[in-house]
Amino acid sequence: VSDGVLQGYILSSYSARKLNMTTTGNSGGVHNIRLPESQYTQDDLIKQMGSGVLLTELIGNGVNPVTGDYSRGAAGFWVENGEIQYPVQEITIAGNLKEMFQRIVAIGNDVDTCGGIHCGSMLMDQMTVAGSAE
């Protein structure tokens, strides 16, 4: 992705064959992503969110690498009026990665440099979340 425009796909041999395209040699997935950071802190993103869920943990492996569809267990905190209110757990997030990336409003400067994926917190304008109140 360059300037918000998709430039190409990350394809294993299998997915390249299915799409009648050329492999990019990424059969094991992506291991070296660096997204640009901004001046926003995670607290800034939480305030900008207003109300929603701050995800802090994803559980399981529910991503289709060919279609980008995902369904993952998650946990985090409920946010109301830009303030963390209480923990939430046993929720599910679902959607499509392409659509999710198009919904990024801002990326924070709290980059975790452990591992090969360097990215700050992301604020999405919408996401499908399911769960029940106890």
PLM segments and residue spans:
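Dual-mode signal for accessory low-complexity, basic/Gly-rich regions
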Residues: V1-E134
